[in-house]
């Protein structure tokens, strides 16, 4: 029976129906699984992160700079745009009113108003000191000869510093003649030394700072009653382009000196004021 079957009986045996299907099913299953495995998984879209370092800064406009930073106007800038104007009696009147407005009543302020008659002709910025003094005081020689009272002067010139006082004294040569001139400032000169000099002989002309002159009046070293002319070095400017009345300390001392009888002397018409 074994011989009937033959040696290669398996080769002629029909393939079972399930075999191809199984093989095909396996192949299809593998293909299907492969396709599933090879489908790309969609990646999550990343939101762009904002980098603060890479941001481009917008240039600041001129308007924003101006609003943040305000530059104070300098006197030099103001003078560069306008011509210098000589001082006037109205300038002094305004300063007096502004200085005393917070401490004096309305009636007292009216009493401090200086009469126009007490003001001499002002410097129009064309004069030297000698030429200006000759114009406002043509009878100086006669006054100088008749003045013999000690502890007093005929004319006072107020300025802002000792250095400026020395400059003014040097420029007085053409005017003073034989008049005795005295330095009235604090630099290198003690008050007591100046008091002794004023007691020793009659002085015709004094040039100095309001602070030292005020101190001499306080110590009875200087009597203001014989004074005939009080001249302010009004228009001159220092290295910072400040006039003497632009400096708060000097301005305060000037008004303190005016309070020591100058106002009453002006109203009695015995004292004249000049703005050089």
Swiss-Prot record:
Keyword Transcription: no
UniProt region (Disordered), positions on chain: 1-91
Compositionally biased spans, kind Acidic residues: 1-10
InterPro entries membership: Cms1, P-loop_NTPase
Residues modified to Phosphothreonine: 209
One Pfam entry name: CMS1
PTM sites of type Omega-N-methylarginine: 164
Gene3D superfamilies, sorted: P-loop containing nucleotide triphosphate hydrolases (3.40.50.300)
Disulfide-bonded cysteines: none
Record has Phosphoprotein as a keyword: yes
Residues with the Phosphoserine modification: 19, 23
Keywords, alphabetical: Methylation, Phosphoprotein
Family that this chain belongs to: Belongs to the CMS1 family.
Name of the featured protein: Protein CMSS1
Species, as recorded: Rattus norvegicus
Name of the encoding gene: Cmss1
């Amino acid at each position: 029976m074994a011989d009937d079957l033959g040696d290669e009986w398996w080769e002629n045996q029909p393939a079972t129906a399930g075999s191809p299907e199984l093989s095909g099913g396996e192949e299809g299953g593998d293909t299907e699984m492969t396709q599933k495995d090879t489908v790309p998984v969609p990646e999550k879209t990343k939101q762009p992160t904002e980098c603060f370092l890479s941001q481009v800064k917008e240039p600041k406009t001129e308007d924003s700079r101006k609003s943040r930073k305000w530059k104070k106007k300098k006197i030099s800038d103001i003078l560069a745009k306008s011509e210098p104007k000589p001082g006037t009696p109205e300038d002094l009147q305004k300063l007096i009113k502004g200085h005393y407005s917070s401490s004096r009543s309305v009636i007292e302020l009216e009493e401090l108003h200086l009469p126009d008659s007490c003001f001499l002709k002002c410097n129009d910025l064309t004069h030297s000191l000698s030429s200006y003094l000759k114009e406002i005081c043509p009878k100086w020689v006669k006054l100088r000869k008749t003045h013999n009272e000690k502890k007093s002067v005929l004319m006072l010139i107020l300025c802002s510093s000792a250095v400026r006082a020395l400059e003014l004294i040097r420029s007085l040569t053409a005017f003073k003649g034989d008049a005795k001139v005295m330095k009235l400032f604090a630099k290198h000169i003690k008050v007591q030394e100046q008091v002794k000099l004023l007691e020793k002989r009659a002085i015709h002309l004094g040039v100095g700072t309001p602070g030292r002159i005020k101190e001499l009046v306080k110590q009875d070293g200087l009597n203001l009653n014989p004074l005939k002319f009080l001249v302010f070095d009004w228009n001159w400017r220092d290295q910072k382009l400040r006039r003497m009345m632009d400096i708060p300390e000097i301005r305060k001392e000037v008004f303190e000196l005016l309070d020591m009888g100058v106002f009453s002397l002006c109203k009695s018409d015995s004292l004249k004021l000049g703005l050089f």
